[in-house]
Amino acid sequence: MIRTDAKDGALVLFSGGQDSATCVAWALERYQTVETLGFDYGQRHRVELECREGVRDALKRRFPQWSHKLGDDHMIDLSVLGAISDTAMTRAIEIETASNGLPNTFVPGRNLLFMTIGAAIAYRRGLRALVGGMCETDFSGYPDCRDDTMKALQVALNLGMDTRFVLETPLMWLDKADTWRLAEQLGGKPLVELIRVETHTCYVGERSELHDWGFGCGECPACKLRKRGFEAYLRGESVTQAPV
């Protein structure tokens, strides 16, 4: 029998970065209960995990319309993923394109594991929606960020758990400039500023210098994309129109 008792709630995969923080705000606008889920998998930029509580606290303090909706936070030790991965996200190696054409920041199976574990927690918590910041538009080559992957995973999870989860990916067709715009639509300039200062994107974990677009080394692919997106957002352009 298909489970139908899930409440109007969402579990958001929340790393502490720009995209997932925007997804938390997006869910808070749409659901009565929002819980968050983070993973420690041995990532080089582990500082992002330290940003999570600051973002959650700031959302509660600065956005009273959301404070009563933001529920429990869950943190999962997924160090086994780092142990079996040989990538620039989990090793101090140079970021480059691998022989298969994928960036060596790709962690095989990461989003599949994240969503599957998220579904198990959501099932226990009685939450209907799983929300993730996967995106095809700012395409880095990650196959587990594709819309087709998420749709297939939704089918598999619902069959395997005999329920009716909805996998929400609000950023799927947005570029980084659009993601900044979405933050402004959700919470105005205060939310944009919260995300700019409190979230973390840099792959190498640099958090000593605050740029116009946020903290970071300014040189890794994640920093460059965040910078281009923020500058395009300020100009009212898309990332594809922005100079490289």
UniProtKB/Swiss-Prot annotation:
Belongs to the QueC family. GO terms for biological process: queuosine biosynthetic process. This is 7-cyano-7-deazaguanine synthase. The gene is queC. GO terms for molecular function: ATP binding; ligase activity, forming carbon-nitrogen bonds; zinc ion binding. Catalyzes the ATP-dependent conversion of 7-carboxy-7-deazaguanine (CDG) to 7-cyano-7-deazaguanine (preQ(0)). Its EC number is 6.3.4.20. Transmembrane segments: none annotated. The keyword Zinc-finger does not apply. ATP binds at F14, S15, G16, G17, Q18, D19, S20, A21, T22, C23, V24. It comes from the Bacteria. It comes from Burkholderia thailandensis (strain ATCC 700388 / DSM 13276 / CCUG 48851 / CIP 106301 / E264). InterPro entries: QueC, Rossmann-like_a/b/a_fold. Its cofactor is Zn(2+). Zn(2+) binds at C202, C217, C220, C223. Binds 1 zinc ion per subunit. It catalyses: 7-carboxy-7-deazaguanine + NH4(+) + ATP = 7-cyano-7-deazaguanine + ADP + phosphate + H2O + H(+). Pathway: Purine metabolism; 7-cyano-7-deazaguanine biosynthesis. Gene3D superfamilies: HUPs. The keyword Nucleotide-binding applies. Keywords: ATP-binding, Ligase, Metal-binding, Nucleotide-binding, Queuosine biosynthesis, Zinc.
